[in-house]
Amino acid sequence: MATYAVLGATGNCGTALIDNLLRTEGAQIHAFCRNKPKLMQKMPALVDHKRVQIYEGSIDDIDLLAECIRGTRAIFHVVTTNDNVPGCQVGLDTAQSIIAALESLQALEPEGTKPPKIVLLSSGTIDDHLSRHMPSFFRRILRAAASHVYEDLRRTEAFLRAQPDGVSTIFIKPGGLSIDVQRGHALNLDRDESFVSYLDLAAAMIEAADDPDDRFDGKNVSVANTNGAARFPMGTPLCILTGLARHSFPWLHRYLPATGPG
């Protein structure tokens, strides 16, 4: 069975990916995180789990990252932040480390070995086509409220699209996300939808990565609900307000609370 690398394993999407993969028969998981105790606290079932290998360290540790992604089918790049952090570039830094790790592995692998595909968690809000149904004034508000994060995503996407043909990336661009139960999903190339649970998002990412015909490689892919929308995240208003403050007054960042979808 296939092996998958999850980068950003302690986040909402990372834990949802691990949850889904644990329910996939035979799937092996390489979870990369900065803080193993935090991951164990969030997911106690991972302690001594035979199908899970945890890699604890910095994303700048190319040797450790190469060990994590070696022999995998897909690399789920879900390293990001819910807060509009000025100067944010965690997405780009992670993507650059992934490419450096892949290049180091290429020198060790037999010629013709197919590298794992990258599945990047991005956002439908920055995609004019997927989010065209959203009122323009509200889209401007959302783009400002996460301006620093979205700029990081744009730069990350541009970097990955500039890679040689042998490196394939799927760009997952959901609408609003919520911590909620799994209801059922469908991959959608035409529009995003709000709200989608992290569990449904994760299932969609795995489906796209596993597509036998590679139909989603290089494409912007969103996620639709098939059995009702996820609940409204109560933390959204505060997240938007503090994001707008960080956009207009970046120096306020250190004084503002950390937020999340909730």
Curated annotation (Swiss-Prot):
Role played: Oxidoreductase; part of the gene cluster that mediates the biosynthesis of agnestins, dihydroxy-xanthone metabolites. The pathway begins with the assembly and cyclization of atrochrysone thioester by the non-reducing polyketide synthase Agnpks1. The atrochrysone carboxyl ACP thioesterase AgnL7 then breaks the thioester bond and releases the atrochrysone carboxylic acid as the first enzyme-free intermediate.
EC number: 1.-.-.-
Keyword line: Monooxygenase, Oxidoreductase
InterPro entries the record matches: NAD(P)-bd_dom, NAD(P)-bd_dom_sf
Main EC class the enzyme belongs to: oxidoreductase
GN (gene name): AgnL4
Gene3D superfamilies: NAD(P)-binding Rossmann-like Domain (3.40.50.720)
GO molecular function: monooxygenase activity
Disruption phenotype: Leads to total loss of monodictyphenone and agnestin biosynthesis and accumulates emodin but only traces of chrysophanol.
Taxonomic lineage: Eukaryota, Fungi, Dikarya, Ascomycota, Pezizomycotina
Family: Belongs to the avfA family.
Protein name: Oxidoreductase AgnL4
Origin species: Paecilomyces divaricatus (Penicillium divaricatum)
Pathway terms, separated by semicolons: Secondary metabolite biosynthesis
